[in-house]
Amino acid sequence: MLIKVKAKPRSVEEYVKKLGEDFYEVAVKEAPERGRANARIVELLSIYFGIKKDKIKLVAGETSKSKLFQILGEKDQP
């Protein structure tokens, strides 16, 4: 599954908000330097979707606030 993400680096609080069927807003406290914000976005998405971090791949938008991620696999079963 592909999802579009609007990144909000240097936010006061961290969250994942669903804005559309495949469109999310992700706020992180990390600055957009040396991939730190992207790494934190992957962590938050893994928690949100209940999957491992290695199942989330950044496809496009490495240096942009508009990003495209590929989510691989299904949710982990509790």
Question: PLM features: residue spans?
Answer:
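Short loop/turn motifs enriched for small/polar and acidic residues
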Residues: 8, 29, 59-61
